[in-house]
From Swiss-Prot:
HAMAP family: ClpP (MF_00444). Its EC number is 3.4.21.92. The lineage of its organism: Bacteria, Pseudomonadati, Pseudomonadota, Gammaproteobacteria, Alteromonadales. This is ATP-dependent Clp protease proteolytic subunit. It holds the Pfam family CLP_protease. It comes from Idiomarina loihiensis (strain ATCC BAA-735 / DSM 15497 / L2-TR).
Length: 206
């Protein structure tokens, strides 16, 4: 059973009011944080989210190509092609993109976390990271199924090689670990090479 009625609190976005020389100016909280070069990747990774994040990355590069960008991730993962659009843009632009996991970074969320600038990838203390192989579902003729199966296997190998490069792990180890859901704590994520440190308090890294 479904309903068109939505919880109004689910769409409530806090507003921030600032005093300027021309009077008060209000921003939604995400626009205000964007001024501080903070971007959020929260929820399912899909095309609409990816387009918004890519646009913000490109805007911040044009605003200042020499200043770091901070991508905060709390995501269960999602569509691989949408995630790759974000990943490729992170690598394409001039500013370093520092990634921070808050809550969880699973599947494509973990891939984006590890894809941040080396030395600038972090977890919060109680966050969780999960890596696994890409999931595929297809219905159709047998010949089409074979085509899609080959595509998924090729994608799996490519993602594993990129993850191995970003973590410093052997490809064979990454392939074994991603064969099933592989969960890591913040500390284990450091050992694996997914992140470079744990942010416990502002200005304090371990």
């Amino acid at each position: 059973m479904s309903s068109d009625i939505q919880d109004p609190m689910a769409q409530l976005v806090p507003m921030v009011v600032e005093q300027t020389s021309k009077g008060e100016r209000s921003y939604d909280i995400y626009s205000r944080l964007l001024k501080e070069r903070v971007i959020f990747c929260c929820g399912q990774v899909e095309d609409h989210m990816a387009n918004l994040i890519v646009a913000q990355l490109l805007f911040l590069e044009s605003d200042n190509p020499d200043k770091d960008i901070y991508l905060y991730i709390n995501s269960p993962g999602g569509v691989v092609t949408a995630g790759m659009a974000i990943y490729d843009t992170m690598r394409f632009i001039k500013p370093d993109v520092s990634t921070v996991c808050m809550g969880q970074a699973a599947s494509m969320g973990a891939f984006l976390l590890a894809g941040g600038a080396q030395g600038k990838r972090y977890c919060l203390p109680n966050s969780r990271v999960m890596i696994h192989q890409p999931l595929g579902g297809f219905q159709g003729q047998a010949s089409d199924f074979e085509i899609h199966a080959k595509q998924i296997l090729d994608l799996k190998e490519r993602l594993n090689r990129m993850l191995a490069e970003n973590t410093g792990q052997d490809y064979e180890k990454v392939a074994r670990d991603t064969d099933r859901d592989h969960f890591l704590s913040a500390e284990e994520s450091i050992d694996y090479g997914l992140v470079d440190g744990i942010l416990r308090q502002r200005g304090e890294e371990s």
